[in-house]
Amino acid sequence: MKITRLTTYHAAPRWLFLKVETDEGITGWGEPVIEGRARSVEAAVHELAGYVVGKDPARINDLWQTLYRAGFYRGGAILMSAIAGIDQALWDIKGKTLGVPVYELLGGLVRDRMKTYRWVGGDRPGAIIQQITDYRALGFDTFKFNGTEEMKLIDSARAVDAAVVKVAEIREAFGNSIDFGIDFHGRVGAPMAKALLRELEPFKPLFVEEPVLAEQAEYYPRLAASTSIPLAAGERMFSRFEFKNVLCAGGIGMVQPDLSHAGGITECVKIAAMAEAYDVGFAPHCPLGPIALAACLHVDFVSHNAVLQEQSIGIHYNEGADLLDYVINKDDFHCVDGSIAALPKPGLGVEIDEEMLKRTNENPPDWRNPVWRHSDGSIAEW
């Protein structure tokens, strides 16, 4: 079997899908994307195509290493996301060729169901309590929301209090019947993170995500020493080599690599295993589309330290399409009491409606990240 062609499709609201075809008619799907930089990743995918067209798709490890090493320069968001989507598609092809789900190729299940959580509240959170109430009725008991709006490097007591009041209201409304993670989203600088963690600790959040940006990772152990709240990070780390440094330094209780950013299944299986050696949980970042979610689930189902899975049904970014709109076999992704069962079909186990993708690409979406500014006019972290 040889790879014959790579085709990319833009998908609303902000996704990029990749179809990898072979000379035997078996196709694989991947999701290589950086939110807001889909066209850059698309260009990288097609530039990398020369390394894989004409090659045997079964040699996943060799192709991955070639894509990573052959260009001399390596790593970074764009290249690793391009590799991630190609890698996902190769695993999809291999599973379909052998007639088994990808998790069987990775050693088999360590669990029958994977716990997921729901996003509530957006960048400017509104009726979070009502959203939680609605999702509780569907069986979900674990949620995540943004902890702050834009925050200055040194900000006021009012800014801290605004974040605390929101969390206090949620805990008061639901008691300990729910769990929630709080996403600082890289908006909080190191000087304010310690104060926020101290004030939020009485409300027992399940975790705080990106307490500071990845480039300030040296603060993770210092912040962890100041709080009992587990700290989570990893959506803006792109290889096991970046996670190696964070794990060795300590401080993180949960790693969150993104299967569409951090080199795909091949790389993230290794990251999960590294984290397990440090007694650190694995909770893949995935506010993306169905192919990315499927890839995450296969790694979750073979990783003993997988604790939670993010998924984007109903997330505030999903304008124009929701998570399963491009999926034919929607029932396989059905959540029961907030958990998803192991996907039963061969490969990644997601069947994509290519005709719908083609219609979407007649007028392809071009999503961009919001640009925020502080009151003084300076750029703010979104």
Curated annotation (Swiss-Prot):
Residues 361-382 are annotated as: Disordered. GO terms for biological process: amino acid catabolic process; D-galactonate catabolic process. The record marks 258 as: Increases basicity of active site His. Binds 1 Mg(2+) ion per subunit. GO terms for molecular function: galactonate dehydratase activity; magnesium ion binding. SUPFAM superfamilies: Enolase C-terminal domain-like, Enolase N-terminal domain-like. The keyword Zinc does not apply. It catalyses: D-galactonate = 2-dehydro-3-deoxy-D-galactonate + H2O. Its cofactor is Mg(2+). The active site is at 185 (proton donor), 285 (proton acceptor). Its EC number is 4.2.1.6. Pathway: Carbohydrate acid metabolism; D-galactonate degradation; D-glyceraldehyde 3-phosphate and pyruvate from D-galactonate: step 1/3. Mg(2+) binds at residues 183, 209, 235. The keyword ATP-binding does not apply. The record marks 310 as: Transition state stabilizer. Belongs to the mandelate racemase/muconate lactonizing enzyme family. GalD subfamily. Reaction proceeds via an anti dehydration. Catalyzes the dehydration of D-galactonate to 2-keto-3-deoxy-D-galactonate. This is D-galactonate dehydratase. It comes from Xanthomonas euvesicatoria pv. vesicatoria (strain 85-10). The gene is dgoD.
